[in-house]
């Protein structure tokens, strides 16, 4: 007798074989037909019980959400939609589910309702599909870097530096409320705190990854990061995962090559290994698009978007060229953009990025050589003195997906930039050391994993692609 899962049974199509399977009841019809799901696939398997010979007490306990164990024989299914079913010889109730209290009923629930029940929402088709895709994407990330000679580095979550220079950080302290010691000028004295200095949750592992790239050559981080940005939008989370490779002796051109190859590789992997889940999510998104006003509908289905990125060469365009294109575009001239493009130096918005990808070039785009004034201190200054070796990868439907740069490897230039941006050299003494001892050209990029999952699954809200979202005023579960 074989202990197996639903995915294996449906894939094999074998009949006349005895199996034992455990899972959760999705539906129970006519006191006879159980739709059972064990999480291995989006599909349920029909289990047909012998109503006359099943105790009434057992029948009453077969409710939506109940955990059960089934023993039976695989048979050719008489119903539509699946090749096999299980003719049940024995059923055991492993865990009851009170139908009057169980929130996830066999009907359509709003995403807002499901966020309030995040501990149970993965039992729905949509969220189980999203989380299986997330799992495969995560594996594909590690597989790509490991197959290409990268070392995985675990960078610290508690840090004393702000890699982005934005200041939107969660403070870490051991001081009790209203009992923090203060200095003579009334400020909190962090020298007496646990770490002896002011510390925060990390916003990026990039700086530490640079240190390891300057010894191991090719490294990547893949871990949680935190932003105390008070943004209640469909694109922001306070806790999310970042993918950040860093490579020694690689310039911006190599960095753009790496980003394009990486993205194509992980999307191709998911297209090959998540066909059923992506087909379901594609159909879901198609129905959702029909409810939108015509002008807001996407021209591409989910699968078309994924193949659009995975199969097209990325167009490389300088920021300056992009500004000229946008400034002379019809939407800009007719004032259709929410943020008009009037001059060089403007920080591009999602609407501009999407126009370049979806309307102008009709392929993924990599913008490079941005104005220094709108980018971080660690990006390498170009010879013109006003642009930096930064790059952003732009996707359809979402805009920026990847942000990266060739790092400033020249000690004197980096110090000057830090002073100009009022960044304390003492806080980053170790980062400056990397430019004093064996400095070299090096580059890397950052990619928010949840944003990649959101693009891959077609979910409209980033809170729906992470198991337990952390957002302003929300840290349940």
Question: Where are the regions that the model predicts?
Answer:
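Short, charged, low-complexity patches
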Residues: 134, 252-260
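Generic, well-ordered alpha-helical scaffold segments in large soluble proteins
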Residues: 24, 140-148, 204-207, 211, ...
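Metal-assisted phosphate- and nucleotidyl-transfer catalytic regions
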Residues: 163-169, 174-189, 261-393, 420-440
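TRNA-recognition modules of translation machinery and tRNA-sensing kinases, especially anticodon-binding
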Residues: 196, 200, 214-224, 237-251, ...
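Class II aminoacyl-tRNA synthetase-like tRNA-binding/catalytic domains
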Residues: 3-248
